[in-house]
Amino acid sequence: MRSTFKQLSPNLMIDKIDDNDDAFYVHCHLKNKFSICPKCGNKISSIHSMHTRKIQDLPIQCKTVFLLVNVRHFNCRKCKYIYTEELEFTSKTSHKTKRLLDLILNNSCSISSITSQYSLNKQGIMVKKSAICTYQKKKIFQQLIFQI
């Protein structure tokens, strides 16, 4: 099971996996010891604070999988900028991995969003009809931008 999550990022370290009745909770963190300040380019190892981010991933055995990632906030001593480390397998504000979003979009492109929601929920993917519509709109918008 651990190899499944190594595909997300080679820097992802699994701390423990909790198996609930309806979901897997994967506690993890990034193994990078330092970060590069996006403002000044300085190499930073000073951690300002941490928080846990809950991100849904592809289901395993029809159970929902949640990654509980300890995300660090770095403090640049050179320019006094505080920022959060980025996760390469999800966007900044998303609660789902990129590969899960791809699966949702591929599933919903040929059927209605209501049918898609029902089908995905049966597979262990927690998603609402309105979210499916939002993902489809974002995908269409991105395709239009790349065509220009």
Name each region found by the language model.
Residues M1-Y81, L87:
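Short, conserved DNA-binding cores of transcription-related domains
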Residues I55-I148:
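Short, positively charged, Gly/Tyr-enriched micro-motifs
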